[in-house]
Amino acid sequence: YVGNIRYNTTPSTALQINANDIARLFRKYTSGEALQYLTLTSVPATGSLYYNYYNTSKYGSAQMPLTASTAGNVVFSYSPASASEYDLSELTYIPSGSNYCTSLGFTGYSSNGTTVSATILISVTASPVSEVYSVTTKGTSVNFPANSVYSAVASATGFGLSSIQLLELPASKAGVLYSGSYAADVTTAYSYGDGTGSMSQLRFIPNSGFTGSVSIPYVALNSSGTAIGSGVVSIGVVDSVKKFTDISTSTWCYKYVTELASANVISGY
């Protein structure tokens, strides 16, 4: 599974693709170039993708399903200049079913011909997969919260995961995520349980001078290796972990309070 851009939705909720997310990714991968237009290279295998789903756009056409045979023929403009152009902000995904991941691929172009090919991963679960948060002090390793990830996925999908696949690794400036004594990767399925190659063997070692927040997105896999949802583990690397009397680690804002307190912005909730 690949997810350069990631979205989560529920079975009954239409998902609008955010054109600005694609533009930001394009700038990141091209060191600052602007996205002009894109073409789709694949469409979701599950669910339906539409252009102008709500029939409110003045650009392009009326509501139009985008299928494997038609999607590649349409050019979507980031900033359409005429009514005949198709507006990139008018892509809408309609889920079908629950507890799965699907994707759409695209190639973006700048005005001078620079291209970026990437994938949008869409997770559809009965309820959103909660973010899992851990905190550590700078230079101190922290174990991957395997049990919390399992619980978050089970709560959202009603099913237990068998393994996870990481979608992105921490930036080198932040530190290294290890599996045992080796650097982790984005192709291995790390099993839930103990032993070599398991989630419990994952640990993040921040660089000695780094403080900040690290996000580790993942897809949860069932016993067949099929994705049942995606989520994210966030690790706060702080100068010191302060104790609070007005919130606990399960409070929704604990992540933000912890990191702001470490930066001496606040002293509690």
Region locations from a protein language model:
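Extracellular glycosylation-rich, acidic/polar low-complexity regions of adhesion-
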Residues: 1-239
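N-terminal propeptides
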Residues: 238-269
